[in-house]
Amino acid sequence: MYAFVTGANGLLGSVVVRTLREQGHAVVGSYHSEEPTFDCPLHQVDITDTERVVELLDEYDVDLVINCAAYTDVDGCESNPEVATAVNGTAPGDLAAVCDDREIPFIHYSTDYVFDGETDGFYEEGDEPAPIQEYGRSKLTGEHAVRDVNPDALILRLSFVYGARGDTSDLVGFPQWVASTLAAGDTVPLFTDQTMTPSRAGNVATTTLELLDAGVSGTFHVASQSAVTPSDFGEKICEVIGGDATLIESSVMADLDRPAARPRRSCLDVSNVEGELGCSQPTLEDDLAALEAAFSDYSS
């Protein structure tokens, strides 16, 4: 029997696939466009094509579905709300219903962007969502769609997912951009007025499987203990690679003209997941240390 991972070519999906395989699980993955480089069954599938997904669940006798597929381009969602709703809202509910009918676990990932960011503290799972852009609204629709049809589903909210890919071990996203720009000796403008609790993909994958083993359901926040701005984050990356800190320039969100609004402070409280598993979520320093090998290409 297999674990079925949607979005296997994304950062999070690729790390989930790797972590499952490292723990001895058979995996079948789906991807939307570019095929990842895993030695396991992989299929190009549109996540909104529920009929095709069901065919794969039957073909591989799947006994676990982890939905990593999402439309995560925040500004793209603002311009394409119908696509955002279909991928982030409707499709997760359809998958959750299929899993409920088959009585197999369903795990779905959501986002800190379901909150408006108008807080000076940390959001708990039970706090009232109030998304301020189409991306957050579509992800909240997905949460409701999943919960309405599958009360046993596990929904994990994440914040600013980053890390190294599961298939190639290459650093991607924000840390790769910061590290490569600093290594090239160029300036890096980073926001000082946005605060989040970044979720390292490797920790998310490990925590996901720990929660699965614990047999829990409901909504949990999985993120760093550390509340940081992009500027703070960049400074820590600079320390890791031995870069020139004077290249980091302060910036604010208003400096960029972007279609979608971003929450000012979308920090996630991780007390519930820590209490459930009996261990702490990592600090940013812990997470960056776990990526030491991936940063080595940019170290001076």
From Swiss-Prot:
Disruption phenotype: Impaired formation of the tetrasaccharide present at 'Asn-532' of S-layer glycoprotein Csg. No effect on 'Asn-47' and 'Asn-117' glycosylation of S-layer glycoprotein Csg. Pfam families: RmlD_sub_bind. Keywords: NAD, NADP, Oxidoreductase. NADH binds at G10, L11, L12, D46, I47, A70, Y71, T72, Y135, K139. Its EC number is 1.1.1.-. NADPH binds at L11, L12, D46, I47, A70, Y71, T72, Y109, Y135, K139. GO terms for biological process: protein glycosylation; S-layer organization. The active site is at Y135 (proton donor/acceptor). It is an enzyme of class 1 (oxidoreductase). CDD domains: dTDP_HR_like_SDR_e. Pathway: Protein modification; protein glycosylation; Cell surface structure biogenesis; S-layer biogenesis. One of its GO terms (molecular function) is oxidoreductase activity. NCBIfam families: rmlD. Belongs to the dTDP-4-dehydrorhamnose reductase family. Reductase involved in N-glycan biosynthetic pathway that takes place under low-salt conditions (1.75 M instead of 3.4 M). Participates in the formation of the tetrasaccharide present at 'Asn-532' of S-layer glycoprotein Csg, consisting of a sulfated hexose, 2 hexoses and rhamnose. Involved in the addition of final rhamnose (sugar 4) of the tetrasaccharide on the dolichol phosphate carrier. This is Probable low-salt glycan biosynthesis reductase Agl14. It comes from Haloferax volcanii (strain ATCC 29605 / DSM 3757 / JCM 8879 / NBRC 14742 / NCIMB 2012 / VKM B-1768 / DS2). The lineage of its organism: Archaea, Methanobacteriati, Methanobacteriota, Stenosarchaea group, Halobacteria.
